[in-house]
UniProtKB/Swiss-Prot annotation:
Residues 1556-1572 have a biased composition (Basic and acidic residues). This is Protein qui-1. WD repeats lie at residues 909-948, 951-992, 993-1032, 1035-1074, 1077-1117, 1119-1157, 1162-1201, 1205-1244, 1247-1285, 1287-1328, 1333-1373, 1376-1415, 1417-1456. The gene is qui-1. GO terms for cellular component: axon; cytosol; dendrite; neuronal cell body; nucleus; perikaryon. Involved in the avoidance response to the noxious chemicals and repellents such as quinine in ASH and ADL sensory neurons. In response to the noxious chemical quinine, promotes dauer formation induced by pheromones such as the ascaroside ascr#3 in ASH nociceptive neurons. InterPro entries: NACHT-WD_repeat, P-loop_NTPase, Quinoprotein_ADH-like_sf, WD40/YVTN_repeat-like_dom_sf, WD40_repeat_CS, WD40_repeat_dom_sf, WD40_rpt. It comes from the Eukaryota. It comes from Caenorhabditis elegans. Gene3D superfamilies: P-loop containing nucleotide triphosphate hydrolases, YVTN repeat-like/Quinoprotein amine dehydrogenase. SMART domains: WD40.
Length: 1592
């Protein structure tokens, strides 16, 4: 019935161990990437136009869909389209690609034409000399033959290779063929080449098609589908060439013989079609009805046969299971191990550091951290790999890691976690400790523990450790000085010019010198040997001088590859020369487009992705003369020619083609992506590809051949995700600058985030946000990463299925403050839960988990900064800052990228300190003012000013730009302000009324009014259009230091030298109020765009005020002893940037509340009691300040609230048996009766003088209540007065009365070891029926929710006892716990009893036999237990805030939920579609739902719902609704019991969980006060109030 967590595990421990052992072993089985290529081969483009069109239009889309759904890439290569007439060189290229990939397939088209003879691509030396001699003897054209071939001495035997340029001219090609055939025939007749195989001899006279076919027929199994077409009874006119018919009789016989041979040998792979057109006009036939029938027939045949063949050569289609962390680590290990083997494949190259490596390999002696460093491309990686190889597996556990090799090898936290998990696997150590940690500090502590536990030394090898990134989310550890554990040897390579964070103190440093000439020669000779070739002495001599270059080793490898690939190399021009030759061979555009996409990608692309990205650009295709699609053969040739520039790695079963070295990426980007626009354009094209935006579903399938890109949908029909989209879409959206697409399609898209978490791990998901944080400063991404995902790590480590619950719970809490993208993420998470069916799932229906506050977003220290008066401005998109004030160089302006904290430029033009900086609204320019009396205008692309203005006669103090960036207003110590036209630098207007220095400027939003502040104690407002002063803001007692104006122009804030801070009305100029509480002089002011928050900067601190009421909201402390002279707020109103000395701090200022006020309010609203109605429709709760709230559980909203007694906590709450009334008791002894349907007060009783702890229903509308002093009162529910029916003492609460209302269970007041059962007769006082006892204190008791025959008691004596209620007989003593039993529950049918104890153990018992059904262990002491109505599921809550759901049959964990607070109590409905939690210190009512386990009713009165609760659409009207479900009577209850007269009506399960919930609802607090307004967004309506009654 249940699909528990056990089924989620992808592999058992043994399987993972085997996988890891294989990865760490000496030799790995070669993996084939999941890619199939279909080659369509025929004589030329025209002969099989109709068949090829059918393949393109009717077959390829279906095959692409099959491939996508089956998880393999499908490449389609139409050879005639790409290359025209078939030649031997093209045929050999196709054959080689076909043989290299066992998953490829050929569709071979043969018709009536035999094809033209082509020249061989190579001749053996003896063949060449014999033919040349014969041509000479026959007086043939020896010269044209000699020019066509050049000798290649690099093979095992010398041969002559065809020069490609020699056959480009058709006339010259005909002469070569004529001379070659004549020479070959003569040589054969003379006997000089008779020893050659007959087929080799015939190739001089055979068409490429025949040669190609015969090569295919020799391969077994033959992965080829033949279409044999014959036009019967048609004879071609010899004088009129025909694209479909052969004009040469001999060739006609050859093609017929060839087709007959194919039919005999490959009958099951042959499609034979004999067509009988009425004339030689074949095109007329194809346009006829018979032609349509032919086309439909071959389309069916192609579809059927190719689908079957592709299915045979590709793995069977299975849903991709989620990956466990251990499997992810094992997959990573395999990829790194395969790369290691490729590095070692060259063999043992002798280097001058070999002796040093031998010393390091003695791990029994050498322990510590060894740093191998050197220049780029000096062989550090090779040294590390050889060192790894030298250390035996018997002597140590070894793990090797290549930084940036895979998508999970970029960030330190992810890298070290993977390394630790790999160590666990190979050393058989339990990975539990590692799996619980995600932050680098905790991971490194786990590593130290692992190393100590290992029974052998642990050797870790990390390549390019300096490239590991340390993000601020999970990788912040600072500079560590700890020494490595004794059992650890850590070997790392690093550039000798880059800083290294080795995480442990470096023990030794090994320097790798630049590779010598002899070492390079040895390396390139090994390269040749690897492919069974050799280098001549002349070539080696030519390579030696290349080592003088900086990148000599790469040049040598590239030129060697060129020699081995082409047979020769000019060896000129270094790497640029090599690229130029490749461009000349394949076309500059063809090479440039392929390389730019590879260079733009993070780790590389598949060949299909490169092909599709280029094919989507129609303009580029036309420029390359490729009208339909980018040539796959050309692309393969380019990739092969690039050789050592590229590296190929198999990741996610795809071969990823990337740049081989980080140093090459910059070079290639500078060559092919020359501007930032080029880079963004490349990323945008790739984001289009992975967003699946290149698919044109409207494309007509009949009119023209057109290529549709391979699908990149997010998931397949079986639910498996598309790994390539998950890997790359976010990256290219980010770098294209399209942040809306980034959020909408990836990082704020729940399905995307969920898939990344499931298949790559949440640690990798956070790496994506880490990477974004190094590129952009963005609020939404920060919220998701820092306020949702990082706090959810503890939850996700325990239950990966809880991502949706965490997103819903945290982001719904702040729904009204969220952006559209964040709220969409919540909606998608709800919809995801709707469709979730993998296993039971706990989800929150209300929100109470507040996202953690992130006051400081980022801070960084400026290098070599001597603090002074630091001024700063922001770019329009708030990604860059311009800053000045470094006393070491006071006139210099520095530009920093905020996210990466990198200096990106300097601007020099001032001779004295800069006083102000301001940027244009489009970031095209910025303006600076200075003590040198100048105003400079700059553009970001130039380091010198474009304009320098000298209109002032004293220092220029500040400047401001109009909103249209057309005018600049400057202020100076010469007592004036001037308005300057930016385009010309001309002064348009002067403002000269001040008598002191003008120190601050502000403009109204319409640019009409200018506000100036001066040292003459005056603030003036000017009309910009005429330069006249229109008002003055007086009353100041000191010079003005700075000004600020709100964005709605309502208020002007003035700070003065006497430390005063005042708010003025802009309209009237009168002072409104003075702001108090700051310390010292205010140096800078800025108003947030919500027109409410004001930020005032003093020395080291920024004070935040509510500008409307003057209340101080927050204090931001930079902890630097310097004045803050500049404040800027981002255009999106999320971030405040403050420079203080050498430190720049970015603050999150989206909302500031007075914390003390909120804390007090929350404490008043803490819940103290909860109750669930018997029909499961309603809930009630009471708070610490005396509020009773009634909830409609169908919509999960509070519908009524009532104050019982203000300030007296509610201590108990209960519904009547018929669910019509809610009764609550409080600390003062008051009892309140509410009508549950309308919230109206029915009665208020004062029968107790102390805290009421229990209220229960009896028969005949009677109620019983019990207080903390043991006073028990029986009273009438509908009585006219407060006179109790009976008052008694001696009963200690809590008490319990079953729905029958005729007995009561309670504690004895005299002994905590005893309980009693009392019966209520028709007349008279209660009668003691039985006594229940333990040897120690009774800590808990339980009966069936409907009453029943048994009661269970738990005790400090660690036992559980089961008693008969009627007689008080002890039926079972259940012993199994090892600590105090804290809670217990009995199932509805009384078959099972469940107990929980402080020993962190839950035991399910059989009531009749007393046997243990199952036992489960938890992580903390159990606080409460409950069961579903059908007894199949038990819920447990723990002290550490977890709700866990267990199967009562097997004890399997079904689902968990983290409430993030200690849980006191859990109450669930019959089918657990609604669950109530009572948490410590929580002012909201947590309501949960359990999905996918509807209780199967054991009573006929219960009906199972059609499906579990959904989490989708919402009702906007939070009205109390009645269920439309069928209401049944409980046959157990009598029908004449007064208050209990109606049987507890139970409806069917509520409507789908979130169907009736209001999606726009944020948190619902149980107290809403009249608070003084703080922050209302000016551009959005104020947050909607809770639908509860407002309490004053």
């Amino acid at each position: 019935m249940f699909r528990g967590k056990g089924q989620q595990q992808v592999s058992s421990t043994d399987n993972i161990k085997a996988m890891m052992t294989a990865a760490i072993g000496n030799k790995l089985e070669k993996r084939l990437p999941l890619v199939s290529t279909i080659f369509v081969v025929g004589n030329d483009e025209e002969e099989f136009n109709i068949e090829r069109r059918t393949l393109w239009q009717d077959v390829l889309p279906d095959l692409q869909n099959l491939a996508f759904q089956s998880n393999f890439d499908l490449e389609f290569c139409d050879v005639p389209l790409e290359n025209g007439e078939l030649t031997n060189s093209v045929a050999e290229h196709v054959l080689q690609m076909w043989k290299d990939n066992p998953r490829s397939w050929i569709v071979l088209l043969l018709g009536n034409r035999y094809g033209n003879v082509s020249v061989p691509t190579s001749l053996r030396k003896e063949e060449y000399e014999s033919i040349r001699s014969s041509i000479f003897e026959e007086n043939g054209n020896v010269r044209v033959f000699e020019k066509a071939y050049t000798i290649n001495r690099n093979g095992a035997v010398e041969e002559y290779r065809l020069v490609p340029s020699a056959i480009k001219d058709k006339k010259q090609l005909a002469e070569i063929i004529k001379a070659l055939q004549a020479g070959a025939k003569a040589a054969h007749e003379e006997g000089s080449i008779n020893q050659v195989h007959e087929q080799r001899q015939n190739r001089f006279f055979s068409s490429p098609l025949e040669t190609f076919v015969r090569s295919i027929l020799q391969v077994s199994p033959c992965r080829c589908l033949f279409l044999l077409r014959k036009f019967d009874q048609l004879v071609a006119d010899p004088n009129s060439p025909n694209a479909f018919l052969e004009t040469n009789d001999q060739n006609s016989r050859k093609i017929e013989d060839l087709k007959n041979e194919i039919t005999l040998k490959m009958n099951d792979r042959v499609m034979t079609h004999v067509l009988r057109p009425e004339s030689t006009d074949i095109n007329y036939f194809f346009n006829s009805r018979d032609g349509d029938k032919y086309r439909e027939k071959i389309a069916r045949q192609f579809n059927e046969k190719l689908k079957n063949h592709l299915a045979d050569i590709n793995p069977p289609v299975r849903p991709e299971p989620p990956k466990s962390p251990m499997v992810l680590a094992a997959n990573e290990a395999r990829t790194h191990q395969e790369f290691l083997e490729n590095q070692l494949a060259l063999g043992n190259l002798k280097r001058d550091y070999d002796k040093r490596l031998d010393e390091l390999a003695s791990v029994k002696v050498n322990r510590g951290v060894f740093l191998i460093q050197g220049t780029d491309l000096c062989g550090k990686t090779q040294a590390l790999c050889r060192l790894y190889h030298k250390i035996s597996d018997k002597d140590a556990y070894k793990v090797i890691f290549f930084t940036n090799l895979t998508y999970s090898s970029n960030f330190a936290h992810e890298a070290w976690r993977t390394i630790c998990l790999n160590i666990c696997s190979i050393s058989n150590i339990d990975p539990k400790e590692v799996l619980e940690h995600f932050k680098l500090g905790g991971i490194l502590k786990s590593l130290e523990e692992l190393v100590q536990k290992a029974d052998k030394p642990v050797c870790i090898f990390i390549d390019d450790v300096h490239l590991l990134k340390f993000g601020h989310l999970l990788s912040q550890i600072g500079r560590r000085t700890e020494t490595a554990p004794d059992n650890l040897s850590l070997f790392m390579t690093s550039s000798n010019v880059a800083p290294v964070n080795a995480v442990f103190a470096v023990t030794q440093t090994v320097n790798v010198d630049v590779i010598s000439e002899n070492e390079v020669v040895g390396m390139v000779q090994k390269m040749a040997e690897k492919v069974d070739k050799k280098l001549t002495n002349e070539q080696i001599s030519a390579i030696r001088p290349l080592m003088a270059a900086k990148d000599g080793i790469l040049i040598a490898k590239s030129f060697t590859h060129e020699i081995l690939f082409n047979g020769n190399s000019s060896m000129k021009g270094g790497m640029d020369g090599r690229m130029t030759r490749i461009e000349k061979e394949f076309g500059k555009l063809a090479v440039g487009n392929a390389v730019k996409f590879i260079a733009a990608s993070s780790h590389g692309l598949t060949r299909l992705e490169i092909h599709d990205a280029i094919s989507a650009d129609r303009e580029v295709l036309e420029e390359m003369n490729m009208s339909i699609v980018y040539s796959l053969l050309t692309l393969d040739g380019i990739i092969e020619a690039l050789g050592p520039i590229l590296r190929k790695v198999i990741i996610d079963d795809r071969q990823i083609i990337g740049i081989a070295h980080s140093g090459l990426i910059s070079w290639l980007r500078n060559r092919y992506l020359t501007s930032s626009q080029d880079i963004r354009s490349a990323h945008l094209q790739l984001s289009d590809l992975f967003a699946d935006l290149l698919i044109d579903n409207e494309q007509s399938p009949r009119h023209e051949i057109a290529y549709q890109s391979f699908s990149q949908g997010i998931k397949r029909d079986n639910g498996s995700p598309n790994f390539r989209r998950l890997r790359l879409l976010w990256y290219h959206c980010l770098h294209s600058g399209n942040l809306d697409r980034l959020k909408e399609l990836s990082l704020c898209h729940f399905e995307y985030v969920d898939y990344v978490t499931r298949y790559f791990g949440i640690s990798h998901l956070l790496s994506l946000y880490e990477e974004c944080a190094t590129q952009i400063l963005h609020h939404d991404l920060q919220v998701i990463s820092e306020q949702v995902l990082v706090p959810a790590l503890v939850t996700m480590a325990r239950d990966s299925e809880q991502l949706a619950a965490e997103v819903i719970g945290r982001l719904r809490f702040t729904r009204h403050e969220n952006s559209h993208f964040l709220n969409s993420l919540v909606d998608q998470a709800m919809s995801w839960v709707d469709l979730y069916n993998r296993q039971p799932l706990l989800v929150p229906l209300t929100c109470w988990i507040s996202p953690p506050a992130t006051k400081v977003c980022r801070s960084f220290t400026l290098k070599d900064w001597k603090p002074g008066n630091t001024v700063l401005t922001l770019s329009a998109n708030h990604q860059y800052i311009l800053i000045s004030g470094n006393q070491s160089d006071p006139g210099v302006i520095y530009a920093y990228h905020i996210a990466s904290e990198q200096l990106i430029g300097t601007f020099k033009g001032h001779t004295a300190a800069v006083t102000c900086l301001c940027s244009s609204n489009d970031s095209s320019l910025f303006v600076s003012t200075s003590f040198d009396k100048t105003v400079n205008v700059w553009v970001f692309s130039q380091s010198t000013p474009t304009m320098s203005l000298t209109h002032h006669t004293a220092k220029v103090t500040c400047a401001i730009l109009t909103s249209d960036d057309q005018y600049l207003i400057t202020a100076s110590a010469d007592s004036s302000a001037k308005m300057i036209k930016l385009e010309t630098g001309e002064v348009m207007r002067s403002f000269n009324d001040h008598t002191g220095s003008v120190v601050s400027l502000q403009l109204t939003s319409n640019n009409q009014f200018l506000i100036t502040g001066s040292g003459d104690f005056v603030v003036q407002m000017w009309d910009v259009t005429n330069g006249k002063c229109i008002s003055r803001m007086g009353g100041l007692m000191a010079p003005v230091s700075t000004l600020a104006i709100t964005s709605n122009d309502a208020f002007v804030v003035v700070a003065c030298e006497d430390e005063t801070l005042k708010v003025f009305s802009t309209v009237g100029g009168q002072e409104l109020h003075e702001l108090m509480g700051h310390e010292g002089k205010v140096n800078s002011l800025v108003c947030a765009q919500d027109d409410c928050q004001l930020f005032a900067a003093t020395k080291s601190k920024v004070f935040c005020y509510d500008i409307h009421n003057g209340q101080m909201i927050d204090v931001l402390d930079t902890a630097q002893p310097f004045p803050i002279c500049s404040l800027k707020i981002s255009s999106d109103n999320y971030f405040l940037i403050s420079p203080c000395g050498p430190k720049v701090t970015i603050w999150n200022v989206t909302k500031r509340n007075h914390d003390a006020h909120d804390v007090h309010a929350d404490k008043e609203g803490f819940l103290t009691a909860v109750a669930l109605s018997n029909d499961d429709k309603y809930a009630a709760c009471g708070t610490n300040n005396g509020i009773v709230a009634l909830w409609d559980l169908e919509v999960c909203q509070c519908v009524f609230t009532t104050i019982q007694n203000k300030g007296d906590p509610i201590t108990c709450i209960r519904y009547s048996v018929d669910s019509q009334y809610c009764i609550s008791g409080n600390q003062a002894g008051c009892i309140l009766i509410l009508d549950a349907q309308n919230g109206g007060v029915v009665r208020e009783l004062f029968m107790h003088s102390s805290e009421v702890l229990s209220i229960m229903s009896l028969v005949h509308n009677k109620m019983i209540s019990c207080d903390i002093q043991g006073k028990m009162v029986i009273w009438e529910l509908f009585g006219d007065d407060d006179t109790p029916e009976m008052v008694a003492t001696g009963v200690k609460p809590p008490i319990f009365v079953p729905p029958t209302g005729r007995i009561m269970v309670g504690h004895c007041s005299l002994s905590n070891k005893e309980m009693k059962i009392w019966a209520f007769p028709e007349e008279g006082p209660p009668v003691t029926r039985a006594k229940l006892s333990h040897s120690d204190e009774i800590t808990c008791f339980a009966t069936s929710p409907k009453g029943g025959n048994f009661i269970a008691t738990g005790s400090r004596d660690m036992s559980l006892k089961i008693w008969q209620i009627d007689k008080g007989f002890l039926t079972q003593v259940l012993v199994g716990h090892e600590n105090v039993v804290t809670c217990c529950c009995i199932s509805f049918d009384e078959r099972l009893v469940v107990s929980g104890a402080r020993d962190e153990k839950i035991i399910v018992w059989n009531v009749q036999s007393g046997d243990m059904v199952c036992t489960v262990n938890t992580t903390a002491a159990i606080t409460s237990l409950s069961m579903t109505g059908d007894s199949t599921v038990v819920f447990s809550t723990t002290e550490d805030g977890w709700v866990e759901t267990w199967s009562t049959t097997k004890g399997r964990l079904l689902s968990t939920f983290n409430a993030h607070r200690p849980i006191k109590k859990l109450i669930n409905s019959y089918e657990s579609h609604r669950m109530l939690l009572l948490l410590e210190n929580c002012a909201q009512l947590p309501i949960l739902c359990l999905h996918n386990t509807p209780a199967v009713g054991v009573e006929a009165t219960r009906r199972r719902s059609a499906r579990a609760q959904s989490v989708s659409s919402a009702s906007n009207e939070p009205v109390a609704s009645t269920s439309a479900g069928e209401i049944k009577k409980d046959p157990i209850l009598s029908s004449n019991n007064g208050g209990n007269a109606q049987s507890a009506p139970r409806a069917t399960a509520p409507k789908p969980t979130f169907d009736m919930l209001e999606r726009s609802k944020s948190r619902t607090s149980l107290i809403e006060k009249d608070r003084t307004t703080t922050l209302t967004q000016s551009n959005a309506p104020p947050p909607q109030k809770s639908n509860m009654c407002t309490l004053l």
